[in-house]
């Protein structure tokens, strides 16, 4: 049997456990001709352990209208905001600082994100997350 032909890849950010046919999920999957409810059921089942977080998901659509999807770890900015209790980052990050984060907190976030980051070890991953913090107006403590 020949491999299925990939027609399209759809990238979305959906709140864990709360996928429903309303936008943004419905229109994106409807255009590809997928069964929206089937995706919602599978996604909600897979992501129920991470409720409350927005998860990036990559949906691969095949020529026979079947699909597979991969859920990734939450965005680093979301994890940073959650770790230090922020609502939003700074509008002017270099002049107005909105919070502080410790190296230990950075390491926890880096461990969570490690599989999705382009880093070889935990120190490189921590540096990537620290860069995200700086661009949000969060001071990184040594």
Curated annotation (Swiss-Prot):
GO terms for biological process: translation. InterPro entries: Ribosomal_uL11, Ribosomal_uL11_bac-typ, Ribosomal_uL11_C, Ribosomal_uL11_C_sf, Ribosomal_uL11_CS, Ribosomal_uL11_N, Ribosomal_uL11_N_sf. PROSITE patterns: RIBOSOMAL_L11 (PS00359). SUPFAM superfamilies: Ribosomal L11/L12e N-terminal domain, Ribosomal protein L11, C-terminal domain. Keywords: Methylation, Ribonucleoprotein, Ribosomal protein, RNA-binding, rRNA-binding. The keyword Ribosomal protein applies. It comes from the Bacteria. One or more lysine residues are methylated. One of its GO terms (molecular function) is structural constituent of ribosome. Pfam families: Ribosomal_L11, Ribosomal_L11_N. GO terms for cellular component: cytosolic large ribosomal subunit. Belongs to the universal ribosomal protein uL11 family. Forms part of the ribosomal stalk which helps the ribosome interact with GTP-bound translation factors. HAMAP family: Ribosomal_uL11. PANTHER family: 60S RIBOSOMAL PROTEIN L12, LARGE RIBOSOMAL SUBUNIT PROTEIN UL11M. Part of the ribosomal stalk of the 50S ribosomal subunit. Interacts with L10 and the large rRNA to form the base of the stalk. L10 forms an elongated spine to which L12 dimers bind in a sequential fashion forming a multimeric L10(L12)X complex. This is Large ribosomal subunit protein uL11.
């Amino acid at each position: 049997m020949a491999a299925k032909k990939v027609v399209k890849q759809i990238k979305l950010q959906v709140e864990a456990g709360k996928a429903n046919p309303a936008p943004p999920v419905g229109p994106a999957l409807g255009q590809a001709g997928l069964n929206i409810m089937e995706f919602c059921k599978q996604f909600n089942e897979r992501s129920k352990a991470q409720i409350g977080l927005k998860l990036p998901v990559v949906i691969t659509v095949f020529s026979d209208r079947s699909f597979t999807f991969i859920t990734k770890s939450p965005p680093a900015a979301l994890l940073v905001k959650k770790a230090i209790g922020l609502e939003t980052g700074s509008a002017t990050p270099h002049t107005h600082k909105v919070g502080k984060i410790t190296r230990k907190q950075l390491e926890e976030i880096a461990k969570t994100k490690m599989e999705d980051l382009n880093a070889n070890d935990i120190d490189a991953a921590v540096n990537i997350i620290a860069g995200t913090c700086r661009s949000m107006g969060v001071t990184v403590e040594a």
